[in-house]
UniProtKB/Swiss-Prot annotation:
Organism of provenance: Treponema pallidum (strain Nichols)
Family stated for the protein in its record: Belongs to the chaperonin (HSP60) family.
EC number: 5.6.1.7
Note: This is one of the most abundant proteins of T.pallidum and is highly antigenic.
The protein, known as: Chaperonin GroEL
Subunit relationships: Forms a cylinder of 14 subunits composed of two heptameric rings stacked back-to-back. Interacts with the co-chaperonin GroES.
Gene that encodes the chain: groEL
Length: 544
């Protein structure tokens, strides 16, 4: 296929246009008075969202070069969401400002690599300032504040999440589901989650969420790889007679065995899902044993004299339900005996006490949390399906933000931590930088003002005035929902430090890539063939 190439200024202009379009769509959602964005779906009602990453994911531009710029900015939002779970709109606004000002500097003849070096130095100082001013969160009230701010100032969501985290602990698993009623409720169930997803996406049962969900499944726990069908067939035939689904946890499932399981799942003959066993080496054996005890099954292992081909249904674990996505597997309400589970928990606690290695101790604590923490299921209720999906998005955002806050602490929200990091950059000594590096440094300093400007403008206030005043006194910022100046942390307008830090680092990373781009290559769009319609057959009058 033939390709088209753009170079230098021409390429950068097109990329900037794409970046600008996606930024314009995303930035309107920022802050307490951010606006909604409507997303058209292929079927049903449009989705209403204020979630930056959901908006970014929908953007596909017609021009291939503009689309490249948009996709790079989409990467900023997605990466920030993956690492910190929130801050996608902030990251997008920061990146657009850096790209816009950076490309102006390149057009004026400055060296892109030196600009990037200056930007990296500024980001390092700003990140350090954010870390130094972060404050650890301890109380349940502070957890609720973080959650409600991330959920667009919804106090009810903050309260629900704080109560769930208090119940299952910081490392416990919290699942967000749709309720069948208008009420939003929280249920606590015993369960375990480990970081392995489905081996093949063909096992997925819910295409919208890309998840496999099975009720009342059997659980096969095997400590080796399964590649041939003959070993597994006798057991599958017995399970098929029961009509219940099967979750297979093994070192790996590949080749003929995987193909057969996929075909059976797609046909509906036997609902199955295969996942790789968690952990490595001896730790994997211990984790498989944990799963077996929780589900009331047994690890099928030749070390114990058990072979897969002669395994019986009695050796399989069971659970009320399992949920598998591309990264995690959650086993809810396993059928294991509570005495066996308690004994296992006590055994792990003794191992933690005896452990001399910090790493081993940390891994043992993770296993303990999985066995004893259980799973909190938050069921989101709303009047309409559109409202329910929008609320569910906000709850998922808030949960991620809260976890990030527990991990790295909190900073003042509302863009204040970033603009006060900009104030720290103003005091920095630039004498050791080249002129072009100094410009790169100032580009970041200017970009750090952009989130507070955008929050103010979304609330109908002049952003430049708010930005200048916000630099005056540390901790005092503009509450856009009440339109007043307040002590941000005291009134609970807070952001997780991890979210703010990740947004800045990811924005600077992608901006640097765009600034140092000299050539863009894209496929030439195919022209649709416009075949003229066949002429009517003249002279055929009188025929019926």
């Amino acid at each position: 296929m033939a390709k088209q190439l753009l170079f230098n200024e021409e390429a950068r202009k097109k990329l900037l246009s794409g970046v600008e379009q996606i930024s314009s769509a995303v930035k309107v959602t920022l802050g307490p008075k951010g606006r909604n964005v409507l997303l058209e779906k292929g079927y049903g009602a449009p989705t209403v969202t204020k979630d930056g990453v959901s908006v970014a994911k929908e953007v596909e531009l017609e021009d291939p070069f503009e689309n490249m710029g948009a996709q790079l900015l989409k990467e900023v939002a997605t990466k920030t969401n993956d690492v910190a779970g929130d801050g996608t709109t902030t990251a997008t606004v920061l990146a657009y400002s850096m790209v816009r000002e950076g490309l102006k500097a390149v057009a004026a003849g400055m060296t892109p690599l030196e600009l990037k070096r200056g930007m990296d130095k500024a980001v390092a100082i700003a990140v350090d300032d954010i870390k130094q001013n972060s404050k650890g969160i301890k109380s349940n009230e502070e957890v609720a504040h973080v959650a409600s701010v991330s959920a667009n100032n919804d106090k009810e969501i903050g309260r629900i999440l704080a109560s769930a985290i208090e119940k299952v602990g910081n490392d416990g698993v919290i699942d967000v589901d749709e309720a069948q009623t208008m009420e939003t409720v929280t249920e606590f169930v015993e369960g375990m989650q480990f970081d392995r997803g489905y081996i093949s996406s063909y096992f997925v049962t819910d295409r919208d969420r890309m998840e496999t969900v099975y009720e009342n499944p059997y659980i096969l726990i095997y400590d080796k790889s399964i590649s041939t069908m003959k070993d597994l067939l006798p057991l599958l035939e017995k399970i098929a007679q029961t009509g219940r689904p099967l979750l297979i946890i093994a070192e790996d499932v590949e080749g003929e065995a995987l193909a057969t399981l996929v075909v059976n799942s797609l046909r509906g003959t036997l609902k199955t899902c295969a996942v790789k066993a968690p952990g490595f080496g001896d730790r994997r054996k211990e984790m498989l044993e944990d799963i077996a005890i929780l589900s009331g099954g047994q690890v099928i292992s030749e070390d114990l004299g058990l072979k897969l081909e002669s395994a019986d249904i009695a050796l399989l674990g069971q659970a009320k339900s399992v949920k598998v996505d591309k990264e995690n597997t959650t086993i809810i309400d396993g059928s294991g005996k509570s005495k066996d589970i308690k004994d296992r928990i006590e055994q792990i606690k003794k191992q933690i006490e005896a452990s001399t290695s910090d790493y081993d101790s940390e891994k043992l604590k993770e296993r303990l949390a999985k066995l004893s923490g259980g799973v909190a299921v938050i069921k989101i209720g709303a009047v309409t399906e559109v409202e329910m999906k929008e609320k569910k998005h906000r709850v998922e955002d808030a949960l991620n933000a809260t976890r990030a806050a527990i991990e790295e602490g909190i900073v003042a929200g509302g863009g204040l931590a970033l603009i006060q990091a900009a104030a720290a950059l103003e005091k920095a000594d630039l004498s050791g930088l080249t002129p072009d590096e100094a410009v790169g440094f100032k580009i970041v300093r200017r970009a750090l003002e952009e989130p507070i400007r955008q929050i103010s403008e979304n609330a109908g206030i002049d952003g430049a005035v708010v930005a200048e005043k916000a630099k005056e006194k540390r901790g005092i910022g503009f509450d856009a929902s009440k339109m007043e100046w307040v002590d941000m942390i005291k009134v609970g307008i807070i952001d997780p430090a991890k979210v703010t830090r990740s947004a800045l680092q990811n924005a600077a990373s992608v901006s640097g890539l765009l600034l140092t781009t000299e050539c863009a290559i894209a496929a030439i769009p195919e022209k649709s063939s416009s075949t003229p319609p066949a002429p009517d057959m003249g002279g055929m009058g009188g025929m019926y």
